[in-house]
């Protein structure tokens, strides 16, 4: 690494960005069971088990509400076709509450399979890094002390923005994991609404929302792939310009590309819902 402070500041900001980008590639391929050593997952499973007992109790309540709403009288309930339909609904709803965790894990594994396929086809890995061009390093090192003063201000501002964007990006990806845990923990309660016809829309909405959270990983990976291809071609800088102009142009274009990536990752949930009509 160069001994120049301005170069070091820019490189440190890029290293932070590259580190967070590599963390994203690791996070999107992890499962809730392996995230942070599985400690959080064990607690979530315990909570899910406790919620399951509540869900089964609510199952009966929603079933009774459904019977009262859909059947006009007790005589109608006694009809074989109605009784059979109600029994099948109750059995299916109970199975969904009992095996809801397995259902949710199956949905997650399908989305992870798509993520793995996209990463394999693209051949883009976490090793794709943003690197400070040699032309920028040469221009900065060729500056005198007084010429480098405005460069300090430019690199401080640019480095700070890059660092902030790095943390915003990684926080969004961590937020996806937190949402997965939250959905898993309380799953039995919304799933119990399948027992009643008037309340089943809540259960459908829950499964759609959970599927959208799982599919966010695909949008995040695609966004990172597109950014990696952008980053492989450094911004074009006019070498005949002053060093401060070159650095400002480079940082401006770099931050613009980073803003596009961060914005897409932050809106991944909205993008999925618009694509899938969820």
What are these regions (language model features)?
Residues 94-186, 224-277:
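Non-cytosolic segments of integral membrane proteins
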Residues 58-94, 186-200:
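Hydrophobic transmembrane alpha-helix segments characteristic of membrane transport
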Residues 44-52, 84-88, 92, 175, ...:
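Alpha-helical membrane-interface segments at transmembrane helix boundaries
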Residues 53-65, 157-163, 180:
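Hydrophobic alpha-helical transmembrane segments
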Residues 191-208, 240, 271-277:
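Alpha-helical transmembrane segments
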Residues 1-58:
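Binding/recognition "hotspot" determinant
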Residues 1-10, 80-100, 203-213:
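Alpha-helical transmembrane segments and their helix-start/interface "positive-inside/aromatic belt" motifs
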Residues 23-26, 82-89, 116, 120, ...:
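Short amphipathic alpha-helical coupling elements at transmembrane boundaries
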């Amino acid at each position: 690494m160069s001994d120049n402070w301005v170069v070091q500041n820019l490189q440190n900001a890029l290293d932070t960005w590259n580190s967070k980008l590599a963390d994203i590639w690791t996070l999107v391929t992890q499962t809730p069971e392996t995230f942070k050593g599985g400690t959080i997952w064990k607690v979530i499973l315990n909570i899910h088990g406790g919620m399951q007992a509540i869900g089964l109790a609510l199952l009966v309540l929603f079933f009774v509400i459904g019977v009262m709403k859909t059947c006009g009288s007790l005589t109608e309930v006694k009809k074989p076709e109605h009784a059979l339909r109600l029994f099948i609904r109750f059995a299916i709803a109970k199975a969904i509450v009992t095996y809801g965790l397995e259902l949710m894990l199956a949905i997650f594994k399908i989305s992870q399979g798509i993520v793995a396929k996209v990463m394999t086809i693209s051949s883009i890995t976490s090793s794709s890094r943003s690197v400070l061009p040699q032309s920028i390093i040469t221009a900065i090192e060729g500056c005198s002390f007084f010429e480098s003063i405005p460069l300090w201000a430019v690199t401080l501002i640019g480095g700070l923005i890059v660092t902030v964007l790095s943390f915003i990006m990684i926080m969004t990806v961590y937020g996806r994991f937190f949402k997965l845990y939250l959905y898993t923990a309380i799953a039995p309660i919304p799933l119990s609404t399948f027992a009643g016809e008037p309340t089943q829309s809540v259960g459908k909405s829950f499964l759609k929302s959970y599927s959208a959270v799982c599919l966010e990983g695909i949008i995040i990976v695609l966004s990172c792939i597109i950014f990696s291809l952008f980053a492989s071609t450094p911004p074009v800088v006019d070498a005949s310009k002053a060093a401060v102009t070159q650095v400002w142009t480079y940082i401006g274009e770099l931050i613009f590309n980073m803003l596009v990536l961060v914005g897409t990752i932050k809106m991944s949930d909205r993008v999925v819902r618009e694509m899938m009509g969820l």
